[in-house]
Swiss-Prot record:
Protein purpose: Beta-cyclopiazonate dehydrogenase involved in the synthesis of the fungal neurotoxin alpha-cyclopiazonic acid (CPA). CpaO carries out the dehydrogenation of beta-CPA to yield an unstable enimine product, which is captured by intramolecular cyclization to create the pentacyclic fused scaffold of alpha-cyclopiazonate.
Protein name: Beta-cyclopiazonate dehydrogenase
Leader sequence residues: 1-20
Keywords, sorted A to Z: FAD, Flavoprotein, Oxidoreductase, Signal, Virulence
Family matches, as SUPFAM superfamilies: FAD/NAD(P)-binding domain
Similarity comment text for this entry: Belongs to the beta-cyclopiazonate dehydrogenase family.
Cofactors demanded by this protein: FAD
Transmembrane segments: none
Known EC number: 1.21.99.1
Amino acid sequence: MATRIASFIGISTVASLALANGINVPDTISRDVIILGAGSSGTYAAIRLKDEGKTVAVVERNDYLGGHGETYYTEDNTPLNFGVEGFFNTSVTRNYLERLQVPYGRRNPAPAHEDYVNLNTGQRTEYPPGQLQDREAFAKWVDAISQFGFLDDGVYRITEPVPEDLIIPFADFVKKYHLEDAVYALFSHTSGDVLEMITLYVIQYIGIPHAAALNEGYVRPIEGIAALYKSAGKELGSDVLLKTTPESVQRSKDGVEVTVRSADGTKTLLKGKQLLVTIPPLLENLHGFPLSDQESRIFSKWQYHQYWAALVNDTGLPDDVNIVNVDTERLYGVPEEPFIWRLDNHWAPGYHNIKLVGGSDFGEDEAKAYMYEKLDLLHEEGTYSTHKPEIVKFASHTPVTMFVSAEEIRGGFYRQLYELQGLNSTFWTGATWASDYSTLLWGYTDEVLDQMASS
């Protein structure tokens, strides 16, 4: 009771006492919804909420919106996307782009032929013998996973009891459903050691909607992925607090208070009726959150991979070549972590995207050293005249493939995860809660916004 009584002391009295003692009183902003994170999900939610007449405050640690959706512009203003390179061509995507008046078109990769190289030896090889190309492989795969229709929208809406085939290692699923000749094509759309992954997570990388999108083609903003987020930034204006991080979060059924600190040290108190968290719910990301026992227990279970997206210039690689990694010593040609997945040619001469994947200890320094090592190896073997490149951008997409054990899934982990929605005026969305593809994340975010509206 004493705490509740104290909370009603006049604000002016508290401010006067604070000023008299040299304490800075943070400015206060009141909004309907406070959003943590302005990546793909957070930005989409902010625009949708504003369209519904809600007021928002969006807290973002970076100096830009869009998270992994970054674009580098060359001197002649050619947009080079790295990380997110396109969106599924669905009504959700088209409506969003048109809402923000962002011109878009079909995503076409830069013209190039693919060279298959074993990056453990630095030597050229071939597409893994006996492995199907994408279209044929996906047809077999879709037939095998069509039994899990509850995953078709990318959300972890898993039936209980959990089907055992969903939580066996992918290598076992492959043998059971005679998919041995489809593995390499499927690997190229996942992130991690695919043979050891639980089948559920492979489906969340390349499931029914993903295969359909690959067949139908992607779309992308003509002026680069960043154009979408620049337009959203103009719409949101001062409702976005860039280069700002939450310091403390207080939540109850009556509303939320979030104290944030900007890059210059200024503190601001954000008061809202609801909180929408779009950042990955790892315990290390939730400092300042007094989590419930249920939240702490669930969020402590996560494991994940590290994923780095490098945009490099002047590698010595030809401009008309994509390098695809094939490990000729491993089953189905699938590399083991850490590995470079691909080196892709770009739309401007000299530029390539490099995608690197590793375990939880594959940090930025390790990833850069690994990249240099493999480029050196290509030179030493005489495969290409490669040399140390200029790193234009080196972006972290960590954590990627956030996962839990088969035992946790069998025990109802995802049901318990979704039961957190709405507790203490707090809602959650983002890549942990649905397949990590923007179009699917936007679809799930729409569901969450409906829950918020009805709570």
